[in-house]
UniProtKB/Swiss-Prot annotation:
Cofactor(s) listed: K(+)
Highest classification ranks of the organism: Bacteria, Pseudomonadati, Thermodesulfobacteriota, Desulfobulbia, Desulfobulbales
Database matches in Pfam families: MMR_HSR1, MnmE_helical, TrmE_N
Gene3D superfamilies assigned: P-loop containing nucleotide triphosphate hydrolases, Probable tRNA modification gtpase trme, domain 1, tRNA modification GTPase MnmE domain 2
Stored SUPFAM superfamilies: P-loop containing nucleoside triphosphate hydrolases
InterPro entries tied to this protein: G_TrmE, GTP-bd, GTP-bd_TrmE_N, GTPase_MnmE, MnmE_dom2, MnmE_helical, P-loop_NTPase, Small_GTP-bd
Keyword annotations from UniProtKB, A to Z: Cytoplasm, GTP-binding, Hydrolase, Magnesium, Metal-binding, Nucleotide-binding, Potassium, tRNA processing
Protein name as it appears in the record: tRNA modification GTPase MnmE
PANTHER family reported for this sequence: TRNA MODIFICATION GTPASE GTPBP3, TRNA MODIFICATION GTPASE GTPBP3, MITOCHONDRIAL
Subcellular location: Cytoplasm
Amino acid sequence: MAISYADNETIAAISTPMGTGGIGVIRISGKESLTILQTIFRPHNDSCSYRSHQMYYGQIVAADGHQLDEVLVVYMRAPKTYTCEDIVEIHCHGNFLVLQNVLELVIEKGASLAEPGEFTKRAFFNGRIDLTKAEAVIDVLSAKTRKGVDVAQEQLAGSLYRRIEPIRNALVHMRALFEVAIDFPDQSHDIVDYEQIDLQLKTEVIAPVKELLAGVDRGRIYRQGISMVIAGRPNVGKSSLLNAVLQEERALVTSIAGTTRDSIEEMVDILGMPVRIVDTAGIRRQAGEVEALGIQRAKDLINSADLVLFMVDGSRQLDQSDLELYEDIAHKPMIAVINKLDLLAEDGTAAAALLDFVPASVPRLAISAREGEGLEALKQAIFTVVTGSDTPWDEEGCAPNLRHKKSLEATLIAAERMVDDLAQGMGSSDLLSIDMQECLDQLGDIIGITTTDDVFDVIFSEFCLGK
């Protein structure tokens, strides 16, 4: 249910990740923050004035006088804080046991343990950020690549809100005209220029909404990434390629076919995309029981992958087993990779054979995983196949997420329905006003104006404790 934080309880949580580190931070937010700090903090300087946004050195001390830790603290006075409430941060040594002891003392003095995302939830309900910025905080925390961080930071800076607000303003203006026309029906045609409304709907609503929808899949790729499987017969160099892309000896490489018997997965940044790259067991008909299990797992991974690198050995002629493997994976998005460029047969038999049964529409590249040749071209090909673009997208165009998609699609449907009604001479002010309000409600749902409580619960539950 909706919550007003005007006189809500003071909350606290550990804001830094679990584990050992140099510094660990406990965050407190609410009207009792400073009072709680004053009861547990012994400043090094007895004349501590607790000026806002200034750090103080001292000790956290339990009621019995026992020192829990030597700390730095900062008090931040509302409203110029993350939550628009009084906030205290206690910077302790980064041992989780120390942090837990201090947090328990803070709770003992009157704070409640914060729920996941509750600090950001308060920032939203107290008007500091809109809902798109709250979601961007999640994306900043979970981004897997630098490009993903840039996309999230762009949204955190308000890029999505800035693109939606002009659309809403145009709709508000048009709807206001309709409302006046409804009140004065005999003058409606003098009040509303329906040709102008048609033009505005097309240029100020439909066109920008379509642009926003185009960014949903882009944003998904940068946020969630893709899965990519390296598939091929035994000993074609799949593990060597994994090691080359990761620039580390992650997979065991030998000249013995069937060395890899289980899948090896790692995350890699390819032109800003998080790519979960999977090295699989070489697929062949004759295999022992353990290897056969690895082969079946490889087939399962191929079926669930977003992209398959179909690898062949360029130092030998291809045979029926290569063709059979290709036929098994032909339904997947694919790049054909001819490995062992350094040993490539002089007559080009591997490349020529690939041309025989791989469609021309499938990108193909010759590389040497061992020597690192052709890897940059392969990365570019991977990016192009996945995105349909040769260059990375700008961050602003990647802001919308899957939650926004539903609202944008509903907005588009309502706006296009209005255009159709106007074209057929069926658009009355009262009916058009209803569709206008539908558009406003859907766009308001994105930025948090008309969002339902259950949606809030889902969004903020994705946060970690302390944020």
